[in-house]
Amino acid sequence: MPNVNHSGYSNMAYGHSYYDYILEIYEYVHQIFPLSKNREDNFIAGHSMGGYGTIKFALTQSDKFAKAAPLSAVFQAQHFIDLDWIDFSAQSITGENTNINGTELDTYHLLNKAVENQVEIPKLLIMCGKEDFLYEDNIEFIRNLDEKKIPYTFEDSSGEHNYAYWDKAIKRAIEWFVE
């Protein structure tokens, strides 16, 4: 799994171009291994900020992925930006304007654009532990999917925002990918 630090899988205002980096990895992996580039053969998953990256790529690179599994995802990226981080500044991602609502960093904005542009959104498996601090954000996002009549599968179970939950969730996601 690629390391994107605390970039939010974004091209940072003051830092690296991690969104482009992930796209480069996608292309590189398909060049060096005998892998299909057909949409139906490619899937994406991630947990926490990686779940945010998963939904971001599912909505902006939907031609590449048939299925996407955001696990314990940060769907309200503004919450991530507003946290008081000890080891980085959100402005490294956003620049001087830390209000990301309605920007390319906002998953709701990306979803609205995808719907407006009639994008074929990948099939979604959204998973989150019921004790996860992001659980309500996940519920709010699926309500938004319901309003837009976008199909998805939602699975919740006992679990917190930790690797004990994600280990089970990624196994389930892999099973779902090959169904």
Positions of predicted regions on the chain:
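Non-catalytic cap/lid and distal C-terminal segments of serine-dependent acyl enzymes
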Residues: 1-179
